[in-house]
C-alpha cells in the first residue's frame, strides 16, 4: 500500500490554546479515511494541515513528492448577484471544455453545465465541487463535510459516488464528518478525534471503543437498503443491492 501523507506527533495551538495534540496517522493510496469528532475537536484544522494550509507547532508531516490534491471545502460563498454558471466556475482554473464535461459526467452532473451556481441545490453543489476537485486528477481527495446540506438519499448517493471515485482514481480520501449522523460503510478507517486521536480503526471496531462511547454514546446499528460495498481479493470494489450497514451517530444537538 503506497503511503501518500504521514503525520507524526503533530501539535498545534491557537492563542495558547491546544487545538491538536500529538496526532499521528497515515493516508494511503486507495484507502478512505473518515475523521469524526464533536464540534471543536480540530477536524477542519487537521484537514488544513494535511493540505499544507497550516504549519504545525511541532511534529512532522510528510507528503509524497508532487502530490496532486483535490479539495472540496466545507462551504462556498458566492455573491448572489454574480452571474456565474457551472461552466464558468469550472473554467476559472483554466480547464478545457472536454476536461470539464468529463469531470461533470463522472459525478452525474453533466446536465448542470449552464445552470447558475447560486441556483444549485445542496446535492448539486457538492457534485459540482467534487467535479472541480477531480479536474486535477487527484492522488488525494480531501472532503470537508461533503454531505452538508444534502438530504438523506442524496447523502447515500454521494457516499457511494465518493467510494466509486476513490476506486476509479485509486486515490486516498480524507473525509471530515461534522454533523456526525452517518459514517459510510465503505470507509476503510475511522479516526475519532477530540484534539487528540481517541481511537481509530474499522467503523465497527471504533463504534465499540469505550472512548467513542464516552463522546457519542452507544451508536445504533442500522441497515439501510441501498447498496453494499465489498473489497475482494482481486483488488476491485464491488457494489451490490440491496443492503449497506451504516453506523448512525447522535447529532451534535442531542
From Swiss-Prot:
UniProt keyword annotations, A-Z: ATP-binding, Cell inner membrane, Cell membrane, Ion transport, Membrane, Nucleotide-binding, Translocase, Transport, Zinc, Zinc transport
CDD domains for the chain: ABC_Metallic_Cations (cd03235)
Gene Ontology MF terms: ABC-type zinc transporter activity; ATP binding; ATP hydrolysis activity
Positions bound to ATP: 37-44
Catalytic reactions on record: Zn(2+)(out) + ATP(in) + H2O(in) = Zn(2+)(in) + ADP(in) + phosphate(in) + H(+)(in)
Region annotated Disordered, chain positions: 233-254
Organism in which the protein naturally occurs: Aeromonas hydrophila subsp. hydrophila (strain ATCC 7966 / DSM 30187 / BCRC 13018 / CCUG 14551 / JCM 1027 / KCTC 2358 / NCIMB 9240 / NCTC 8049)
Protein name as annotated: Zinc import ATP-binding protein ZnuC
Principal localisation: membrane
Pfam families: ABC_tran (PF00005)
Gene Ontology biological process terms in this record: response to zinc ion
Gene designation: znuC
Taxonomy, superkingdom: Bacteria
Family: Belongs to the ABC transporter superfamily. Zinc importer (TC 3.A.1.15.5) family.
Gene3D superfamilies: P-loop containing nucleotide triphosphate hydrolases
Gene Ontology cellular component terms for the protein in this record: plasma membrane
Amino acid at each position: 500500500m503506497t503511503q501518500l501523507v504521514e503525520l507524526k506527533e503533530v501539535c498545534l495551538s491557537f492563542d495558547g490554546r491546544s487545538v491538536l495534540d500529538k496526532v499521528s496517522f497515515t493516508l494511503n493510496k486507495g484507502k478512505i479515511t473518515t475523521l469524526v469528532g464533536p464540534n471543536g475537536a480540530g477536524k477542519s484544522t487537521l484537514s488544513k494541515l494535511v493540505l499544507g494550509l497550516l504549519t504545525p507547532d511541532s511534529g512532522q508531516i510528510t507528503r509524497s513528492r508532487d502530490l496532486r490534491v483535490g479539495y472540496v471545502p466545507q462551504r462556498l460563498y458566492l455573491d448572489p448577484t454574480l452571474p456565474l454558471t457551472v461552466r464558468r466556475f469550472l473554467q476559472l482554473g483554466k480547464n478545457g471544455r472536454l476536461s470539464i464535461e468529463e469531470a461533470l459526467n463522472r459525478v452525474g452532473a453533466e446536465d448542470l453545465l449552464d445552470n447558475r451556481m447560486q441556483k444549485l441545490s445542496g446535492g448539486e453543489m457538492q457534485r459540482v465541487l467534487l467535479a472541480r476537485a477531480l479536474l486535477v486528477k487527484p492522488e488525494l481527495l480531501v472532503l470537508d463535510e461533503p454531505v452538508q446540506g444534502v438530504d438523506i438519499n442524496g447523502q447515500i448517493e454521494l457516499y457511494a459516488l465518493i467510494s466509486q471515485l476513490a476506486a476509479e482514481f485509486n486515490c486516498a480520501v480524507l473525509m471530515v464528518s461534522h454533523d456526525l449522523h452517518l459514517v459510510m460503510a465503505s470507509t476503510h478507517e475511522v479516526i475519532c478525534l477530540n484534539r487528540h486521536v481517541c481511537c481509530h480503526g474499522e467503523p465497527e471496531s471504533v463504534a465499540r471503543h469505550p472512548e467513542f462511547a464516552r463522546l457519542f454514546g452507544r451508536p445504533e446499528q442500522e441497515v439501510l437498503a441501498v447498496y453494499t460495498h465489498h473489497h475482494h481479493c482481486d483488488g476491485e470494489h464491488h457494489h451490490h443491492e440491496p443492503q449497506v450497514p451504516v453506523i448512525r451517530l447522535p447529532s451534535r444537538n442531542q
